[in-house]
Amino acid sequence: MRQTERVNPVQLTPRRLAGLADVPHALPYQGSKRRLAHVIVRLLPADTDRLLEPFAGSAAVSLAARHLKIGGTAWFSDINAPLIGLWQRILDDPYELADTYGRMWVEQRADPAAYFLSVRTEFNEQHAPHHLLYLLARCVKAAVRYNRDGDFNQGVDHRRLGVRPDLMRSRLVRASATLAGSRAGVADYRDVLAWATERDVAYLDPPYEGVSATRDHRYVAGLPRSEFVTAMIAAVASGTSFLASYDGRSGDRVYGEPLPADLGLLHLHLDAGISSQATLNGESAATVESLYVSPALVRRLGGVDEVVGRLAAPGEAARGLVGSAGRPPLCRNVEDACSDVAAPDREFADLP
């Protein structure tokens, strides 16, 4: 049996890091990556050169890592070109973007619903970054939806006017400063994996198999399981350090089958809290997400027990579920941030 093989996934309830409580998230983007970032940063070796995030979305993991100053830089990418265009504006000129958003926020007040529809039409024709920022701030529960032609088609949230201009400015400027020196680009995840060096770490968060077999309106494109497995085989063979969120469960609904055991990946089951998608549908369902750790990264971190030990609660370690002797050090900034947070995470859309 290989070092990273286990018959059953390791079950863990991730602890939140106090040091991530004030990460400046620029984009209101539905999903669980903000919670998972508390896990990912614990698994980044102290010698990490670059964090690669090829399914960027809200770039929550890149923001968390750079907020804690882990690694030299972050390179995040996506095949969603308008989204990357927005991120490039945030990196290059957050003040001008904030000014434009502020003007739009004021202009909408005469007829918010009609203004939203007008901006949505313009965005689908022009793909301007400021249009996308406004739509993300104003759409229902920050839940992005696309039609079969790839056009943004989510409706307006009639309960609110979106993030206030002063607060949006603060988020954009702080996110830009946090990501200083980072790069955003349009790229296929397979190319990103091919660029990785031995001291890089890639975090992959592709559409799950359960939402990729058919056209899912949350993504501009799906991802066939066979393609992703082939990419993982190549990444393992090349010795790439990576983490991948793939299959999972929300309530009774299962998203996809586990990745093949013969890949030799360490399989963790993480309690990700209440599903934001279920909440949007008026339901309450606990979410369990799978996180896979590549053999190369497990070796860099000192072995399976040491990986689990970075994530397990003290009581789990005391019961002998994990080892502790000889554990490679965490990045200093992660150690400083490791006190637990009692208050629950809140979704971006619920913040003032």
List the predicted regions and their residue ranges:
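Short aromatic-enriched loop/helix-cap "lid" or pocket-rim segments at secondary-structure transitions
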Residues: 86-89, 144-148, 255-257
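SAM cofactor-binding core of SAM-dependent methyltransferases
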Residues: 47-120
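Class I S-adenosyl-L-methionine
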Residues: 1-75, 79, 182, 187-196, ...
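Generic structural hydrophobic/aromatic packing signal, biased to beta-strands
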Residues: 87, 133, 152, 175, ...
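SAM-dependent nucleic-acid methyltransferase catalytic core
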Residues: 2-42, 46, 93-203, 207-215, ...
